[in-house]
Structure formats: C-alpha cells, structure tokens
Swiss-Prot record:
The gene is IL10. The keyword Cytoplasm does not apply. GO terms for biological process: immune response; negative regulation of B cell proliferation; negative regulation of cytokine production involved in immune response; negative regulation of inflammatory response; negative regulation of interleukin-6 production; negative regulation of membrane protein ectodomain proteolysis; positive regulation of B cell apoptotic process; positive regulation of cytokine production. Residues 1-18 form the signal peptide. Major immune regulatory cytokine that acts on many cells of the immune system where it has profound anti-inflammatory functions, limiting excessive tissue disruption caused by inflammation. Mechanistically, IL10 binds to its heterotetrameric receptor comprising IL10RA and IL10RB leading to JAK1 and STAT2-mediated phosphorylation of STAT3. In turn, STAT3 translocates to the nucleus where it drives expression of anti-inflammatory mediators. It comes from the Eukaryota. GO terms for cellular component: extracellular space. Keywords: Cytokine, Disulfide bond, Glycoprotein, Secreted, Signal. This is Interleukin-10. Disulfide bonds join C30-C126, C80-C132.
Amino acid sequence: MPNPVLLYCLVLLAGMGTSQGENTQSEETCTHFPGGLPHMLRELRAAFGRVKIFFQTKDQLDDMLLSESLLEDFKGYLGCQALSEMIQFYLVEVMPQAENHSPDVKEHVNSLGEKLKTLRLRLRRCHRFLPCENKSKAVQQVKDAFSKLQEKGIYKAMSEFDIFINYIEAYMTAKINS
C-alpha cells in the first residue's frame, strides 16, 4: 500500500500542473516541514518566553481558557479546524489587544504573532496539515469564554499561550505520525 502522505503530495503536484523533474515551493515545504517543526515550536516558545511573566502575573483567574476538550479536538478529526481557528483567534482577537497593554511587551507580542503567521503559512502550503472545513465546538467555547472575560481575557489567553503551543505540537505530531 502506498504511503498516503507521498500519494497526497503527488496528487497535489499533479493538480498544480507541475511537470516531471521540477521542484516546487509547495513540494519543498511539504517534504521539509515535519523536520523543521521542532525548530518552529522552539521559536514560538522562546518568543512567548519574552512576555510570559508579564501576562501570567496579570492573569488572576483560576479557570482555564484552553480546555482539555480543545486538546481532544486537536487530537481528533477536528484537529485541523481547531488549529486553524485557534491560530486565527490568537492573530485577530488576542494579539492585537495584547500589544496595547504595555509598550514593554508590544514588540515581543508582535514578534510572537509574526512567528505564528509563519507557522500558519507553512501549514497551508502543505495541505496535508490543514485540509479542513468543519467547525470546532471547543474553539467556539474558548472564544465565548474569552469574550465574557472582557479585558481579563487578554491576560488569560496570553498567559496560556504555552498551552496552545503544546496543543499545536500534539496536533502536528499526530499528523506526522499518521
């Protein structure tokens, strides 16, 4: 039985009209992405480390925003959509507000956002990692809880960014191993 990853990349290349013997950026990204993932996750963790203490000391709430049900969505059939929606949530709703909480963290939050955008771009280039359409109820629960927390939601979401990185890692590890 052929390797499904190899088969998918071949179908992707054929669909793009790639002639035999040419290497495309998508093919390169798809082939090399799994090997570069640990480095990308280290970069995300290092960037978050620059703002972690700021946001975690301001987060005075005991309840978790990023729940176990979200991790289960990441690991299950909704993993693709959950990851895509959570990246969008952090980039559109959380980080722009987080940048405005202190001039000391603005540059670092911006850098963290750029690294997250780079990850999203690389995931999209290799469709194997983000081929999704369904909505995740767990992500909607995170968004609803975030909205209810109002200003405190920024501190909560940013203080749990390391958990989000762990969920990304769990999703990607499952995809790479499947």
